[in-house]
Amino acid sequence: YYSPYVEEIGTDKTGLGRWSWIRIKGNNNLKTMIISAYMPCKPRKQSMLSNYAQQERYWRMRGEETCAKNKCREDLIKFILESRTKGERVILMIDGNEKMRTGALAKRLKQRDINMRDSICEKVGSKKFPTWFRGQEQIDAIWVSDELNVESATMFPFFFSIRDH
């Protein structure tokens, strides 16, 4: 592996690329799961090639008529709960494509059994800040388990590199 601290690496079991993760083991055998995730959003224009459409086809071919975004959220929550149940700390870096202060994912991550907080929002305070160049809301976040201490955080301006978030 990459470091003696890295215990395991993996991806979303569906193969859809919804998230990837790395589990590290630090001092006192404390384990932390670091997850990088993308939650699809329904495109403004009908597109067979969008990530959302691809994921909906995947589920439909398996007999599930479901919203790709809702399914991703449900599966991600289940994955995080498995880690939390094992006593692991979790860091979730996500392009959530929904409001990170008041959306369904935010509400669920704040509940007692998961107990996570948005570290960016914590550092920025109550200021409203968009995280997508065409948006008005924070749709990206770095959620951390409540027992983790975040010392600092920063955000790059839009178009700092090739990204639009």
Give residue spans per PLM region.
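Active-site regions of metal-assisted phosphoester/phosphodiester hydrolases
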Residues: Y1-D113, E147-H165
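Short glycine- and hydrophobic/aromatic-rich loop-to-beta-strand nucleating segment
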Residues: A141-W143
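Short secondary-structure transition/capping segments
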Residues: A104, F129-T131
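His/Asp/Glu-enriched short active-site or ligand-binding loop at hydrolase and phosphoryl-transfer sites
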Residues: D113-K128
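Conserved catalytic core of two-metal-ion nucleotidyltransferases
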Residues: W132, I139
